[in-house]
C-alpha cells in the first residue's frame, strides 16, 4: 500500500491542536514514524526476530497500540508456532481500518502466515488471554502515567512461563545535560530527514501534552513492581529504546 509524505505541520497553524491518531495521521504515519524515530525499522523487524524465540504453541501474541500493524506484520513474518494467533489492538478507527488493509495486502503476498484479529478497543479495558509475547511499541508513553502500572500487571498475569513483553519507548533522562544533548541530537535527526524548523516546533507543541516519556530506571522499576523478574534493554538509538521484560 502507498502512503503520503508527512506534511501535516509544514504550514503555520493559527492554533496547534493536541496530537491525535486520526485519518490525517494514519495517511502519513509510515513516513512520519520513519523520519521521527531513529532506529524504528530495526526495532520493528527485530521484535519479530525476538518474538520467534519466545512464542509458544496455543498462545496469543499481542500487538498493543498496533497503529498500522508494522509489528503485527513482523510477528507474522518470523513466528511459525502451531496454533498461535496475533491480536492487534488500537483505539483509533483510522489506524484500525488501514491496519486491516495492510494485513490484507500481506496475506496476498505470503502463504501460511499466522492468523490475526484486529480489534478497535481500549487496551486498558482489554481482557487478555494466555499469551507468550506482548509488544508495546511506543504505546505506553501515550497512556496516563497513573494507569501504566495496572496495565503492566495485567500483561504480566497473562504471560505464560517462558513468555516475554517487548516495550519500546521514547526516554527522558534524569541528568539535565544528557537530556539536552539527546534532545538536540534527535532534532538533528529530524532535520536530516527533511523536517523544517517549523514542522519540528509545531509537532513538538502538538505532542508534548499527550506523550509522557519515562526514564529507563522508571520503566525498569515499574516492570519489576508489576511482577516481571528481569528487564533487559536490547536496543537504544538516541532517546529511543526497547526492552525485554521476562516473567
From Swiss-Prot:
Its EC number is 2.1.3.-. S-adenosyl-L-methionine binds at residues 40, 65-67, 90-91, 122-123, 137, 204. Keywords: S-adenosyl-L-methionine, Transferase. It comes from the Bacteria. InterPro entries: CmoA, Methyltransf_25, SAM-dependent_MTases_sf. It catalyses: prephenate + S-adenosyl-L-methionine = carboxy-S-adenosyl-L-methionine + 3-phenylpyruvate + H2O. One of its GO terms (molecular function) is S-adenosyl-L-methionine binding. One of its GO terms (biological process) is tRNA wobble uridine modification. The keyword Transferase applies. It is an enzyme of class 2 (transferase). Catalyzes the conversion of S-adenosyl-L-methionine (SAM) to carboxy-S-adenosyl-L-methionine (Cx-SAM). HAMAP family: Cx_SAM_synthase (MF_01589). Homodimer. Belongs to the class I-like SAM-binding methyltransferase superfamily. Cx-SAM synthase family. This is Carboxy-S-adenosyl-L-methionine synthase. The gene is cmoA.
